[in-house]
Amino acid sequence: MAKSIYLLFLLIIQNLGGMPDNKLAEKELSSTRPKVAFTFDDGSTRDMPNYSLEEWNEMILSNLRKHDAKAVLFANVGPLQNEKGKYVLSSWDKAGHKIANHTYTHPRFSDPKTTLEMFKTELLRNDSVIRSYPNFYQYFRFPYLKEGETKEKVEGFRAFLKEKGYKNGHVTIDASDWYIASRLVERLTENPQADVSGFRDFYIEHMYDRAVFYDGLADELTGRKIHHTILLHHNLAAAMFLDDLIAHFKEKGWEIIDADEAFKDPVFNEVPTVVPAGESLIWALAKQSGKYEKDLRYPAENGDYLKAKMDSLGL
């Protein structure tokens, strides 16, 4: 009897001793896996070929729900000041996603015609609408990721963000999903029965290619695996292909995390000094370092970079 109790005691001690090792191994694995959160820009009220607004919007939300991923919608509410727009905002809010600021009318801050005072008004006007939502998130994303073409505008608006309690809703993984979506809609408008598998494959290939590129830069710049935020738009491509895209990231070993968790990463405290300012945060940090001139292009991402390949593929 005493021997049995002793053996049981040893077994318990052995199992207890193994638990920290297992947790440590899990922690080490997590620290070496790339992580990504999904963020969406704009907000559309359009019906799309084959899908009503309610249908394709719900497809995005359903796929986020399927993968247990909480996103941020950076909304510019100027075009959303109607019943359909209110539906979009409330549907995302009720699904537990954050609603953040993307200006009211989506102006380009790097345009000399867009003054600092005009841009401040854009933030405030948008803020007055989105602040009423329970999941309001005090982050601001620059339209087109353009943060100003002069030092005065860049520093002036950064000071304004801080004054108003906002943080910069940086993208770390930039891409041109909007361009693929525009061609997808064009094809389905021409032929609602068109085979879109080629668009799906190209979308996944493009988004993942940009993720690998920016993750590699981030590794070199920080010496670790950061929490990424990837740029998508509220569009038909996301509705049709998001499930496959997330599955692809998972298959490649990426961990999907919530957007508000991603924004807690210390990398988002970095303030690049390059002017013109903007693009992906990782692009800006690489540009600032002066070590990656052969790897960087300007603009960092653009539909023009995809046109020839999509043309050749008949997309």
Predicted regions: what they are:
Residues L24-L145, I230-L231, H248, K264:
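Active-site beta->alpha N-cap acidic-glycine motif
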Residues R65-D68, Q81, H170, L221-R224, ...:
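C-terminal domain-boundary segment and adjacent tail
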Residues Y6-G18:
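Hydrophobic h-region of N-terminal signal peptides that target proteins for export
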Residues W92-D93, K120, L188-E190, T273-G278, ...:
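Short alpha-helix boundary/capping motifs
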Residues M1-I5:
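Positively charged n-region of N-terminal signal peptides that target proteins for export
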Residues P79-G85, H106-E255, E261:
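Catalytic domains of cell-wall/extracellular-matrix polysaccharide-remodeling enzymes
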Residues L16-E26:
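Signal peptide processing junction and immediate N-terminal pro/mature segment
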Residues V88, Y179-I180, F268-P272:
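Glycine-rich, charge-decorated loop segments at or immediately adjacent to ligand/cofactor-binding or catalytic sites
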